[in-house]
Amino acid sequence: MIEITNLNKIYKIRKRVSEGKFSVLKNFFSTQYNDINAVSDLSLYIKKGEIVGYIGTNGAGKSTTIKMMTGILNPTSGSIRVNGMDPFKDRSKYVKDIGVIFGQKSQLFWDIPVIESLKLLKKIYDVPQKDFDERLQYFSDALKLDEILNQSVRQLSLGQKMRAEFAAAFLHNPKVVFLDEPTIGLDVNIKYQIRKFVKKMNMKFDTTIILTTHDLQDIEYLCHRVVIINKGTKMFDGPLRDVYGLFDSKKTVIVTHDERKPIKLGNEFFNLVNIEQTNGNSTSKLTFLNREVETAKLINSLLENNEINDLTVKNSTIEEIIRSIYVR
C-alpha cells in the first residue's frame, strides 16, 4: 500500500551575511547555504487498512513527511510509492485516491453552504450520484451534518467546520487519508465524534489512515501502530502496546486507608516503590517502574499488610512515555 525507502528531505537555508560591503558583494555572486535535514533515511511499509500514528515533537519532521506522502513536496532522495504511484510525479492521478485534512486549512468553499461545497467536490472527484446520496446520508448520521448543511462555512463554529471537513475528505471514498492535527482546538465531545467516525470509516471501507497529532488520546483511541520520529529520524515503529513495554513506563497505585496507619510493604519492594502521602495522610500514591515491580505482587502485599478502603491502578499515559523518550 505505502512503501517508503531511504527517504530524505534537505532544506537549504541561506547563510546570514556578515556586515561589510565586501561580504555583501561576495554573497551576491556566490550565495552560501546551510543544509537542514528535515527527514533522514526514513523507511516505512504501511499495509492496506492500517491506522498508523506518526508522532513527534514540533520540528521532528512529521509535517514534512506528510507533505511528501501527499505529493506537495518532492523528496531530496529516496522513494515513496502509494498504490504503485509516485505522489509527486503522478500527482494529478494520485490525488483522486487520497483524502487530506491539514489542521485548520479548509478544503471547503468559504462563502457557500456546506452542501454546495460537497456537490462541487462530487463533480471534481466524479462521484456517482447514487454513491454521493448514500455517503451524504451516512455522513449526516455519523457527523450530525443536517444542522449545518445549508449554512455557509464562514458561519460555522470550529467544531462544525471540522465535521464538514471530514465529510469532504471521505466523500470520494479515498484509499488513503492523511490527517495532520485533525482535532486541534476542538472540545471533548467533537473529538469523540470525529474519532468514532474515523474508526467506523476504517472498519467499513478498509481505509488506510496516517495520523499526526499532539493529542495522544487520538493515538490511543485509533491507532494500530505507532511511528515515533525525532529530528527527522525514526526512533520507534511498532504496535502501540509495545510503546508501554519497551520504555521505562511507570505505574501508579493509589490507595485510601486509615490516616493513622502509614502504608506498609514487604521487604522485596524496598527502594523500588516510591510512596507519597496526600489528602491528610489518608491517601497514599505508590509509583514504580513496570519492569521492576509486578503489580499483582505489590497489590497482594498491600492487602496483606494494610487495611485498604479503596485501591486504583493507573498506567503511564502515552504522552508521559513519549516525553521520557525525548529527554533521554
Please give the residue ranges for each predicted region.
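Conserved ABC ATPase "signature" region
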Residues: 20-27, 119, 123, 131-148
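Catalytic Walker B motif of ABC-type/P-loop ATPase nucleotide-binding domains
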Residues: 177-181
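ABC transporter nucleotide-binding domain
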Residues: 195-285
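Conserved catalytic motifs of ABC-family nucleotide-binding domains
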Residues: 173
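Conserved ABC ATPase signature
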Residues: 152-156
